[in-house]
Amino acid sequence: SDFKGFAACPGVQVAACCDVDTMKTERFRRRVAEWQASKGMNQRCDQYEFYEDLLERKDIDAIEVATPENWHALATIHSCQSGKDVYCQKPLAYTISEGLAMVKAVRNNKRVLQVGSQQRSSKEFQAAIDMVQNGAIGHIEKIYARVGEPPTPLSLPEMPVPANLNFNQWMGPLNDPKIHYHPDLCPPISLDPEENEKLWGAWRWYQETGNGYTADWGAHMFDIAQAAIGMDGSGPVEFTPKGYNGTQYSTMRYANGIVMTEQPYLEDNPDAQGIKFVGDNGWIEVARGYINCSDQSKIPSDLK
């Protein structure tokens, strides 16, 4: 899906693609070739199985890292070291230490790194941030953020690895003998996509391969909350996980005293991912395609 965004930028040419599944690189190459031909471009899109080979090319300016999150750190660090700027999908890193190493690589190599937090550009989230910062509901007392459940133990049965997939390379830094191939982790695709084709890898939902909804949706929702309360360049100073000393929900406390609780807040849709800001003069609820406020007059007219 990110290809559409790059394609809309004048002068951008997609020169190469890399994946551990050769079926995916071939399908992507065909899609790029069709698009570039329609624009009168003759840039060839080369295919790679190992990203290190791609990074050796001097004619490539920037890389997108859209792998499972266990590869984000190494791919980003190596891209920076090879002189490439990086657009990395969220969540930025698999662990905190990896994230710090990525920041160091960007700064040491004077590169540009952008993270896929496109939700912040959506009108309803921009409006919510502005409303909070402009005092629409007074002093913020607490925040509820609903992102979903943390990861669960891997419980998928082992299945034969497709011939077109290098599963050892897919695992990469994980190096865990408990992890084995199952199509839910890395869904097979065809060159001629079916209407009901499954593309969403379930690796993100398991402890051994991902960080669950907490990272997948938290990267979006926690980002909005931090931006609204002026903690954009920081993070919580205290985290209490769900179940610790009998706590029902996870909480994050910030240096300014505000506590964000990860729990449902919409009675009619408890599974919805979104945020509720509670102030001493009202509340604001925001999710994708939705915004509400205790004082309807505070909502921008184009969002009512």
Cite the ranges covered by each PLM segment.
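Conserved structured core elements
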Residues: 69, 73, 93-96, 122, ...
